[in-house]
Amino acid sequence: MTVLIHVLGSDIPHHNRTVLRFFNDALAATSEHAREFMVVGKDDGLSDSCPALSVQFFPGKKSLAEAVIAKAKANRQQRFFFHGQFNPTLWLALLSGGIKPSQFFWHIWGADLYELSSGLRYKLFYPLRRLAQKRVGCVFATRGDLSFFVKTHPKVRGELLYFPTRMDPSLNTMANDRQREGKMTILVGNSGDRSNEHVAALRAVHQQFGDTVKVVVPMGYPPNNEAYIEEVRQAGLELFSEENLQVLSEKLEFDAYLALLRQCDLGYFIFARQQGIGTLCLLIQAGIPCVLNRENPFWQDMTEQHLPVLFTTDDLNEDIVREAQRQLASVDKNTIAFFSPNYLQGWQRALAIAAGEVA
C-alpha cells in the first residue's frame, strides 16, 4: 500500500510546528501513514525535533503545489492529507483533475472554509474554491464546521476531528485558585491576527462592562505587526484607562501564556468563524468561560460537551460570568472530546480513512 503523505500547504509556523510535533510524539510510532510530510516554510530545527518524521520543506506555496501535483499524477493511488489549506494552486488542481477526489483528504482549520476576505482577488477565487471543495474525498472538521460545510456540500463525506491543541491533561482537575470576585480580567482575541477584530472587540467589551474591567490583548504573534498593535493600543486607550488595558506585543512561551490565561475571568472572541480552538481549550481547562459570536459554529461543539456558552449578543454582567464559571467548574474535563488525549482517537480514525484502510 502507498504511504499517505501529509501536506501543510501554507507557511503558518505556529500551527505547522504544532501538527508536526503532535504527529512525531503521538502518531508516528504506531502508523506508517503518520510519517511523511510536505511543508511550506523553513526547517528551523523541526527535522531535529521531529526525528520520527520524514519532512520535505518548500520555499513557497507554488513550489509545494507543483510537487504535490506531480506526485498525484505519477501515481493515482497516492493519497494526500491536507491540513488547513491556504493554497490556491492545490484547489485549482483538484478542480481541474490534476489531483483526483480519491487522493484528496482535507482537515478544515476554520479560516480555509469561510469567505470573509473582501479583496477582489479573494472574491474572484472563492467560487472556484467552493466548486473544488465539492470534489474533496472526505473532510475532517469540528462539529460546527461540518454543519457549516454540509449546507453547501451535502454529498461530501464528513468526519469529526479536532486540531491537536497542546495540552497537559493533568491540569484538567487543577482547581483555579484565582479569587472570583472584584474586578474581572477579560482576554480579548487569541493572537495579533487582524481576524480577531480587536478594535471592534474592545468596543463590545466596553459597551458591556465600561471601564470597570481589566482587558488583556495578546498580540505577540504573528511577528512584524507593530503598526497594527499600536493601532489597537490607541483604540483601547480611548475606551479604557491605562491601568485597565494590557496589550502584549511580545510572543509568550507556552507556560507563560498558560499562566496569563489563568489570570483571566473571561475570554471574549467576536470573530464570526471557528478559530482559536487552542486558546479556547486552555481557557476551558482553567475554568474560564468564553464569549463567542453566534456565527462561530464552535458553540455547537461546546454545547455538545455540556459546556456553558456566552454570546456577544447576550446582556453580560459579573453575575452572569460568575454563574458560567460555576457551571464550568462542575464539568468533568477529562470527558471533553476536543481535549487531549481524547482527540487522539479521532486522529487514528482519520489516518485510517485517508489511507484507505477503512471504508
UniProtKB/Swiss-Prot annotation:
Q: Where in the cell is it found?
A: Cell inner membrane
Pfam families reported in the protein's UniProt record: Glyco_transf_56 (PF07429)
Q: Which GO terms describe its biological process?
A: enterobacterial common antigen biosynthetic process; fucosylation
**Pathway per the UniProt entry:** Bacterial outer membrane biogenesis; enterobacterial common antigen biosynthesis
Q: Cell inner membrane: present as a keyword of the record? A: yes
Membrane topology term reads: Peripheral membrane protein
Q: Which GO terms describe its cellular component?
A: plasma membrane
Keyword Cytoplasm found: no
Q: Which reaction does it catalyse?
A: beta-D-ManNAcA-(1->4)-alpha-D-GlcNAc-di-trans,octa-cis-undecaprenyl diphosphate + dTDP-4-acetamido-4,6-dideoxy-alpha-D-galactose = alpha-D-FucNAc4-(1->4)-beta-D-ManNAcA-(1->4)-D-GlcNAc-undecaprenyl diphosphate + dTDP + H(+)
EC number assigned by the record: 2.4.1.325
Q: What class of enzyme is it?
A: transferase
Which GO terms label this protein's molecular function in UniProt? Answer: 4-acetamido-4,6-dideoxy-D-galactose transferase activity; fucosyltransferase activity
Main localization of the protein described in the UniProt heading: membrane
Q: Which family does it belong to?
A: Belongs to the glycosyltransferase 56 family.
What job does this protein perform? Catalyzes the synthesis of Und-PP-GlcNAc-ManNAcA-Fuc4NAc (Lipid III), the third lipid-linked intermediate involved in ECA synthesis.
HAMAP family for the chain: WecF_RffT
Stated name of the protein = TDP-N-acetylfucosamine:lipid II N-acetylfucosaminyltransferase
Q: What is the native source organism of this protein?
A: Escherichia coli O9:H4 (strain HS)
- Gene for this chain: wecF
